[in-house]
Amino acid sequence: MPVTLSTLKALRQKGEKIAVLTCYDASFARVFDAAGVDVLLVGDSLGMVIQGHASTLPVKLAEMAYHTRCVAAGTTRAFIVADLPFGSYQPSPERAYTAAARLMAAGAHMIKLEGGAVMVDTVAFLAARGIPVCAHLGLLPQSVNQLGGYRVQGREDGDAAQLVADARALEAAGAGLIVLEMVPAALAKTVTAALSMPTIGIGAGADCAGQVLVSYDMLGLYPRAPKFSKNFLAGAGSVDAAVRAYVAAVKDGSFPAAEHAF
């Protein structure tokens, strides 16, 4: 049966973890789909891992649509979320709708955008017009220059309270999922408890409703991996076995371990 947003919400209610991986093409989509990954995130991380840029900022909407079509072509079961790239949604809700509609037409089941309270009106605008929205708080890669680098967010009391408030506001506006990136595990646990929608963590501890990794990090393609990642290909023997090990580790709660959290 195809995974839907209702499926993901039901998994959260049952306490079953949601396994998410980034995906950029049809071949990996087929492997990930068959291995039981619940959600495929067509991430603007492709700017770094596919295109070789130093950040996600150069990625264009046309490129996101292209990779979304590729992933959709290889997927029969998993739920597909596609990132709105930098500059495609920030100017206005109307601009966001035009960009989101393009990704939905390419095969996405939901779009993802970054930002807190400033994005509430945009989330409400999209949700009211039938476009499912995944929010994204904590480290915001599209704001890396403003944030001063890839640093853990929410460590200060005021920042933590604001993140919780933003998460609640985004859910009230109509967001159906939310990614929490590089925030302290205790804060992610608090946010998860405050929301009805599933939280998907990356570097956010084990108490989120699900976990996401950049697939290339999970497969150990780089000599240096983020603290929150793990090489599941080491000793697995094949990409398929590695992905199945990742899904199993997320589902049974053994990943992420304390060593992967902040």
UniProtKB/Swiss-Prot annotation:
The residues that the entry says bind Mg(2+) are: 44, 83, 114
Gene Ontology cellular-component annotations: cytoplasm
Name the EC number(s). Answer: 2.1.2.11
Q: Mind telling me which CDD domains this protein's record contains?
A: KPHMT-like
Q: Which SUPFAM superfamilies match?
A: Phosphoenolpyruvate/pyruvate domain (SSF51621)
- Offer one example of a GO biological process linked to this entry: pantothenate biosynthetic process
Where along the chain is 3-methyl-2-oxobutanoate bound? Answer: 44-45, 83, 112
Q: What would be an example GO MF term here? A: magnesium ion binding
- Main role? Catalyzes the reversible reaction in which hydroxymethyl group from 5,10-methylenetetrahydrofolate is transferred onto alpha-ketoisovalerate to form ketopantoate.
The molecule here is called 3-methyl-2-oxobutanoate hydroxymethyltransferase
Q: Which gene encodes it?
A: panB
